A protein has these predicted regions:
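Walker B catalytic acidic pair
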Residues: 155-156
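Conserved P-loop
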Residues: 45-103
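SF2 helicase motor core recognition
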Residues: 53-54, 138-149
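Residue-level signal for alpha-helix termini/capping positions
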Residues: 33-37, 67-70, 144
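Conserved nucleotide-state-sensing and coupling region of NTP-binding domains
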Residues: 77-140
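Residue-level preference for the first positions of well-ordered beta-strands
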Residues: 42-44, 73-75, 133, 150
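N-terminal accessory segments
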Residues: 1-41
Length: 157
């Protein structure tokens, strides 16, 4: 019997229970889930400010995708390195949460100094015992030499 995959909206409700889901959000998260599953190979989202676009695409989506595939390499770029790092830190906090560990026990990151040999900064975090990582960069920054499977561009201007 095939195990049913956790939907993106169910994931979001578990790790961010304070979010409210309007019909717009339900549709938006269904589209993001289709992207995460590869049914939509490339996606551009354009909605007015303060509609939860960044929470969905630059915070929850990378955490969800790393849970589904701990070997995935994801980069987030934004207009400033500071904002991109903020997204990265939010994803790291989700991955550290008890709720996330219950959903995706294979996807873990360095805590404190343990284990050694793994990177964890506000701009880069590696998944323990996997190839996956999350890198963040401002639009003036560089990703040269970094292979990525998913590139999320959020608020470039």
């Amino acid at each position: 019997m095939k195990e049913e995959r956790l939907s993106f909206i169910d994931f979001a409700q578990r790790v961010y229970p304070f979010l409210e889901f309007t019909p717009f959000h339900r549709t938006y998260y269904a589209i993001l889930e289709a992207f995460a599953e590869g049914r939509i190979p490339k996606l551009i989202v354009s909605v007015p400010p303060q509609h939860g676009k960044s929470v969905g695409a630059a915070t929850l989506l990378p955490a969800y995708m790393l849970g589904l595939d701990p070997d995935m390499r994801i980069a987030i770029a934004s207009y400033s390195g500071t904002l991109a790092s903020k997204f990265n830190r939010r994803v790291q906090r989700i991955i550290e949460s008890r709720e996330y560990a219950e959903l995706f026990p294979e996807t873990t990151i360095k805590r404190g100094t343990k284990p050694t040999g793994y990177i964890r900064t506000s701009d880069e975090v590696e998944i323990i015992d996997h190839k996956g990582e999350l890198i963040s960069v401002g639009r003036e920054g560089s990703l040269t030499g970094n292979r990525v499977d998913c590139f999320i561009l959020d608020d470039l201007y």
